[in-house]
Structure formats: C-alpha cells, structure tokens
A protein has these predicted regions:
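Short, small-residue-biased leader/transition segments that mark boundaries at the very start
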Residues: 1-16, 580
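Periplasmic-binding protein-like
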Residues: 248-254
Length: 580
C-alpha cells in the first residue's frame, strides 16, 4: 500500500526511487527532517547502502516498516537485471505486482525508456496478461471485518485471487472518472460535477461505476453510485476496470484535468469515450494545435509561437515585447504557467514548463495587461451550443480563473463584446464538434476580444453558474453524452433578475513562506458564493466570509438608494463604515 499514495496524489515523483528529477545530496539531513520527501530519501539511502539501523537512528521510524521498504528497494534491483519485458518470468512479475510496482515502474526499470512510455507500459501489460497475472477485485469491509459485508465499495489487489463481485458485462453501464485528491486546483467543484453525472446516469437506468480515491469526496460515498472502485486514476487501473466491467463507455469530462489527460490514451486502446471525441480534446489541450486552429478560423488571439529553440523565442519576444506568457499543455491550475518580464525569467520558466509538459509543446504568447477576462461555460451537442453562461472576472487578466472573483451574469461588458463572444464560442464548438461540457476563456479590452484557451471538460465554475442560473449544466451534458432526451432552455432562462458573486479564500497565513501575490497559477483553497439583486450587495458578504475584513472602517459614499441599502448589509455583517 505504500506505493499508492505517491501515485494517487499525483506527486511529481511517482516511484520511491532515484531519478533525474529528484536526488538528495545531503541524505542525513533529509532523513532527519520529517518532510513530504522523506520517503524518497529513505529509498535513496537504501540504494546507497545505508543500513536499516542507521536510517532508524536518523528517522526514528520503526525498523519493521523500514524492513518492508527495503524489500521493495531490493526488488527494484532484481527487476533491473532483466533487459526485455518478455524475459520476466511469471513468479517475478507476480511478486512485483504484489509489492506494488506499477506497469510504468516495471517498464522503467527493465527497459529504461524515455518519453511518455505508453508503448512500454502496454508491453508490460500485455506480457502480464499473457501469464494470467490480473488484479483481484475485493470489497472494502467497513466494519473491521467483524463479518462479511456486501458493499459496492471495491479495490484491486494482487495479494489474493478471486473476485467479490459479478461484473456488468453486456449490461447498460457507464464509467465516470472522478477528480482524485483534493489539492489546489482540484476540489469539490469537480466532485460536484462527477456526482451529478453519476446521478443523471442512474436516473436514465444506467449502472453507474465511479473510479475515485479521495475519501473526503461525496463521489466516494458508496451510496452515490452502483459500484465504486476506490483506486488510483492511472491509465493502468482504468484499463483494468474497463476490461472487467466492459461498460458502454467512459465519461472523462466531469472530473477535471486528470481524466481529461487520459482521453487520448484510452482512445488509442479503443475504449469508447463518451461525449466529445478525444481527438478534439487533444486539439484543444495541445497549445500549438489549438492556436493553429484559431488562426485557421480567423479568430483573434494574443500573438504566439511554439517553443522550438531559445533563440527563436527571444526573437519572438523582441517583436511583441515583454511581458510574455509561457504556457505548457495538458496541465491543471496553471502549473508551470508563468508571466515573464525579462530574459532571465524567460529562460528559467521555459525550462520549468518543458519539464512539466515533456510530451506536448510549450507555447509562448504575448501577455496583454489591463484587460478584462471573461469566461464562457457551456454545453453543446454535435457542435451546437445548447446552454451557456457568460461571467466576468473582477480582477484584470493575469489572475488564474480559480483565484479570480467571478460575477455572473457579467455586468460590465459591452453588448457587442457579449455578442462577439457568443459568435466565437459557436465557431469553436462547431469546429471541434463538441458534445458535452466546455469552457472558453477570453480577453476583452474595449470591443476587442481575444481567445486565451478552451477546455473540453467541465470547469470549476460549472457548479457556480448552474446554481445561479438554476439549470444543471452537468445533467444536460450527461444526457447528451448518453444520447438521452434533455430539456432545451428558451432564451428567457438566461434573463435572470439576480447576480451571483464567487470569491476565493486563501491559506497564505497557514503556509510557511507562501507568496500571497496572485498570478496565472492557482493558489486558492476554497470558494464562497453569494447572491443579490446588484453586484455590490452580494459582494459584501462574500468579502466578509473570505475573512478579508477592514481593520478600521469602509468609507461609504452615499450616492443613490442602492448605496443606502448597502449600509444595512454592512451593519448586519459587522463591517464598520463611515459616511463620505
């Protein structure tokens, strides 16, 4: 079980062993400090010949546990003696799987490949299956094994044989991939989307199968679905579940970036991905392909170029000028996305982006300052937009959408701007033949509109706009993906008399040496939603609940009845004010 946590948390280092990305020069210091990297330093120490007694003296970890880790480290050395996957005998392969080695890790130690390793992973998988080495499916017993319990709470293991359940083969079933561990960038918003997709599938008579591993989520409550696989959201494990269940298809567009990143891999293995084609997902996620598509459609965007060499990028920067934005592909929450103001920052951030997005291109684009950012959340069917929501950021562009204060419906954009945004969004939806949820982010200055990016999945603002609009976008999207009937809204559904404000909460005060300056990478850990009949009224309690309170008082200019009404709200929230 010690092998799963690093993989499940999507930690940058998914094995216990040394790599080019992680190496400790002062091992004694790392071992003596209880950090999140200490387990990796223990593995390195064992590989370098440290005894269990010495590691125990430095870490104070019980020798029994250290001995179990030593077994894993020693087995890595055994796997490294083979040069071909086909040479691994059945007993060695089975023991490796019992010890928690993934197909990815076995391929790495035997073949020492480079790149995304998809081909090598599949070679290990094929060899393993040819020897009949498959994971068993067991029920999680929620009552301390006092007696057998017939729950649908499942996990996979190689330590035993046999299956505790019968599979839904040839039945009407669908797999929904969840959002994984809560962390900055992926939280309850995506879990809301996953739960609503599962509930909609059940309403339509489907057997719903959820794959997720976060015990804090609603989606991992086994009452939510017909079958819950409490297991990692890796390519290997998802294929294992699909091989056993043989569902009608897989929904990858409601769990955030993790499932979205699996779309093309599943497609290449002939797994039916429901909704928008994985080919279209790749055209949107791949920065180079998407920017080229916008140019082809004649849709305006900030000047851009693909990273080919540092010299060419610097030539591009000389033309457009600083600042520029470095943007890797297939990343969550703006990971390794940075604004560069000089050559030194450019070189450092390009290197960082290339490390995070090794398989896909990095794009450098002009960064436009003092512009408004606008979001278009929508659901489409066969390229036709069915329902949508246009919201605006209070902050200027450059603050991640997950950190920005969001106002819906947008209150301060020109009518011509809104019309242009809808036209562009319909063009993109048609070109990508979208069937399901999607989100497009725009820059606007005066009546000039430019596209930033498009995500062919539910965004973190889907719950927000669904609640404000009183239309469940995920239910509509799921019905479309399952070819089920749905209610198409009329134009009056988008003409509402209230305003929603979503503000972010941050944990800077609890994080040592945290930088409180907001940027293009996400930092917030929580969101607050309030409703009102004009923007200032909902905004005041929103600010109150984010703990951003004035130390003295708010200077309040009384101009109009709406300002007078705000004094009542200020008083009710305990916020002091003075008249001006």
């Amino acid at each position: 079980m010690i092998r799963r946590p690093p993989r499940s948390t999507l930690f940058p280092y998914t094995t216990l062993f040394q790599s080019d990305e992680l190496h400790f020069d002062d091992l004694d210091r790392e071992l003596s400090r209880p950090t999140d990297l200490r387990i990796f330093s223990i593995a390195q120490a064992m590989e370098e010949g440290y005894t269990i007694e010495r590691i125990h003296d430095l870490t104070k970890i019980d020798p029994w546990f250290l001995g179990k880790l030593k077994n894993i480290v020693d087995y890595k050395a055994k796997l490294s003696t083979y040069n071909k996957v086909e040479d691994i005998p059945a007993d060695v392969m089975r023991e490796a799987k019992i010890l928690g080695f993934s197909d990815f890790q076995i391929a790495r130690f035997v073949l020492n490949p480079t790149g995304n390793m998809e081909k090598e992973n599949l070679a290990v998988r094929a060899h393993r299956k040819s020897m009949g080495i498959l994971p068993a499916v067991k029920r999680i017993n929620t009552i301390a094994s006092e007696h057998p319990e017939l729950t649908n709470y499942l996990y996979m293991t190689y330590a035993v044989e046999g299956y505790d359940v019968n599979y839904y083969k040839n039945e009407k079933s669908v797999v929904v991939l969840g959002s994984g561990a809560y962390r900055i960038g992926s939280s309850v918003e995506f879990d809301w989307c996953s739960v609503n997709a599962v509930q909609t599938a059940r309403k339509l008579g489907y057997k719903s199968i959820m794959i997720n591993y976060n015990p804090e989520t609603v989606s991992t409550d086994y009452d939510m679905c017909d079958r819950l696989y409490f297991d990692e959201l890796s390519f290997e494990r998802v294929l294992d579940v699909i091989d056993l269940e043989q569902p009608r298809g897989v929904i990858v567009s409601v769990g955030g970036q993790i499932p979205n990143n699996l779309a093309m891999k599943l497609y290449r293995q002939s797994v039916p991905v429901l909704g928008t084609s994985p080919i279209s997902i790749d055209r949107a996620e791949n920065r180079n392909k998407f920017s080229a598509m916008l140019d082809q459609l004649g849709i305006d965007q900030p000047a851009w170029m693909e990273l080919t060499s540092l010299e060419e990028v610097k030539g591009f920067v000389e033309k457009v000028g600083y600042p520029v934005l470095v943007r890797p592909s297939y990343v969550l929450s703006g990971a390794a996305m940075n604004v560069c103001y000089d050559d030194e920052e450019l070189e450092n951030f390009l290197k960082m982006a290339a490390e995070v997005s090794k398989e896909y291109p990095v794009v450098v684009s002009q960064f436009l300052e003092n512009t408004k950012e606008i979001e278009f959340d929508a659901v489409a069917q066969n390229g036709e937009v069915v329902e949508y929501a246009i919201s605006e950021h209070v902050e200027f562009a450059g603050v991640h959408s997950g950190d920005a204060t969001l106002v819906f419906p947008a209150q301060k954009i020109y009518f011509a701007t809104a019309r242009r945004i809808k036209k562009i969004s319909r063009q993109i939806a048609k070109e990508l033949n979208i069937s399901g949820p999607f989100n497009i982010q725009f820059l606007a200055r005066n009546n000039e509109v430019k596209v930033i990016e498009c995500n062919l999945r539910a965004s973190r603002s889907f719950p927000f706009v669904s609640k404000v609009l009183k239309r469940n976008f995920i239910e509509t999207a799921t019905r479309i993906m399952l070819d089920a009937p749905y209610s198409r809204p009329d134009k009056s559904a988008f003409d509402i008399d209230w305003i929603g404000v979503k503000a972010s909460q941050f944990s800077f005060s609890r994080l040592h040496k945290a930088d409180p300056v907001l940027g293009v990478d996400m930092s917030s850990t929580r969101h607050i939603l309030t409703l009102g009949h004009n923007t200032p009224l909902p905004d005041i309690p929103t600010i109150h609940h984010t703990d951003v309170l004035p130390h003295q008082s708010i200077q309040h200019g009384l101009v109009g009845l709406d300002k007078l009404a705000q004094t009542v709200v200020l008083t009710s929230q305990g916020i002091p004010f003075i008249y001006a």
